[in-house]
C-alpha cells in the first residue's frame, strides 16, 4: 500500500510551521516573499488574517472574501477557503499545504483563455467568395 508522503516545507512539517512565529517562518521563504513580510502586513492583510483566525475558532461564519492578492499564504491558512477577487468576481481558493509561501493572487486567474468562434464573412480575403447564409 502506498502511503501519502508527509508534507514538508523546507524540511519542516506543518505542525512545526504552525508553532513558529511569523519572523521565524519568514526566514524560510524565498527573498521576494521574505522582504514583503519583513516590511510588515498592510492593514487589508491584517484584517484578512484577523478574519482567518476568527473563522478557525468558529466565530466568523461568512465566506472570507479579499482583494489582497498580494497576501502570502501562511501555514495558519491551510484548510481554509478564501474567496480572492480577480478583477471581476471572487474566486474560491481552497488553501492546501503546497500553496504555503505563494501569493493568493497566483490561484485566482485574472484573464480567461480566449475561445475563438468561427470567423465571420469578410474576416479573410477568401471569404469574399463564400455564399452568405
From Swiss-Prot:
Subunit notes for this chain?
Part of the 30S ribosomal subunit.
Which superkingdom, per the lineage? Archaea
Cystine pairs: none
* Family matches, as InterPro entries: Ribosomal_uS19, Ribosomal_uS19_bac-type, Ribosomal_uS19_CS, Ribosomal_uS19_euk/arc, Ribosomal_uS19_SF
Q: Which GO terms describe its cellular component?
A: cytosolic small ribosomal subunit
Q: Which organism is it from?
A: Thermococcus kodakarensis (strain ATCC BAA-918 / JCM 12380 / KOD1) (Pyrococcus kodakaraensis (strain KOD1))
Keywords of this entry: Ribonucleoprotein, Ribosomal protein, RNA-binding, rRNA-binding
- UniProt family annotation: Belongs to the universal ribosomal protein uS19 family.
Give the function comment from the record: Protein S19 forms a complex with S13 that binds strongly to the 16S ribosomal RNA.
Signal peptide residues are none
One of its Pfam families is: Ribosomal_S19
Which BP terms in the Gene Ontology apply to this protein? ribosomal small subunit assembly; translation
SUPFAM superfamilies in the record: Ribosomal protein S19 (SSF54570)
Recorded GO terms, molecular function? rRNA binding; structural constituent of ribosome
What is the primary gene name for this protein? rps19
Which protein, by its recorded name, is this? Small ribosomal subunit protein uS19
Amino acid at each position: 500500500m502506498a502511503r501519502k508522503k508527509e508534507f514538508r516545507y523546507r524540511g519542516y512539517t506543518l505542525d512545526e510551521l504552525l508553532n513558529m512565529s511569523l519572523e521565524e517562518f519568514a526566514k524560510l521563504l524565498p527573498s521576494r516573499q521574505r522582504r514583503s513580510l519583513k516590511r510588515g502586513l498592510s492593514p487589508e492583510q491584517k484584517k484578512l488574517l484577523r478574519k482567518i483566525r476568527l473563522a478557525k475558532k468558529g466565530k466568523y461564519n461568512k465566506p472570507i472574501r479579499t482583494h489582497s492578492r498580494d497576501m502570502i499564504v501562511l501555514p495558519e491558512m491551510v484548510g481554509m477557503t478564501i474567496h480572492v477577487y480577480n478583477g471581476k468576481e471572487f474566486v474560491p481558493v481552497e488553501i492546501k499545504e503546497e500553496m504555503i509561501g505563494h501569493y493568493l493572487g497566483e490561484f485566482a486567474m485574472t484573464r480567461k483563455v480566449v475561445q475563438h468562434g468561427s470567423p465571420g464573412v469578410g474576416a479573410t480575403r477568401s471569404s469574399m467568395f463564400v455564399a452568405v447564409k
